[in-house]
Swiss-Prot record:
This is Probable succinate transporter subunit YjjB. The transporter is composed of YjjB and YjjP. Coiled coil: none annotated. GO terms for biological process: succinate transport. It comes from the Bacteria. Its main location: membrane. The chain crosses the membrane at residues 8-28, 50-70, 87-107, 129-149. It is a multi-pass membrane protein. InterPro entries: ThrE_2, ThrE_Dicarb/AminoAcid_Exp, YjjB. It comes from Shigella sonnei (strain Ss046). One of its GO terms (cellular component) is plasma membrane. Keywords: Cell inner membrane, Cell membrane, Membrane, Transmembrane, Transmembrane helix, Transport.
Amino acid sequence: MGVIEFLFALAQDMILAAIPAVGFAMVFNVPVRALRWCALLGAIGHGSRMILMTSGLNIEWSTFMASMLVGTIGIQWSRWYLAHPKVFTVAAVIPMFPGISAYTAMISAVKISQLGYSEPLMITLLTNFLTASSIVGALSIGLSIPGLWLYRKRPRV
């Protein structure tokens, strides 16, 4: 993949990630003045995850580092705009949730219950379930670490 193709793919990924970020921000009753920042932060998070995955990191670690970036930027923006960090960060990480792997794991579980046990279905179920669980864990831990680190009252050393 050339540089131009990568930049177009990155721009497309970021634009398409901003749409659900704004949608979920509207569901969560985020103030109108913060919607554009939720979209931008969702695009930054998903774009940084794509860059990390393209550079060779797996999806779990890429998601963890992207959610740490989203958490850090959200804390900084909350100081600038006098809002709670969750106003920006929660809607911004929603596009990174593992919908496909969770859906595939669920469909495999339904097929196992209907057709009976088979090893390929069980491998598909466990692989996708563990991937989805790892990504959700990476999102939650990565989003909470910047708050624990930046709001710490005691010295770090």
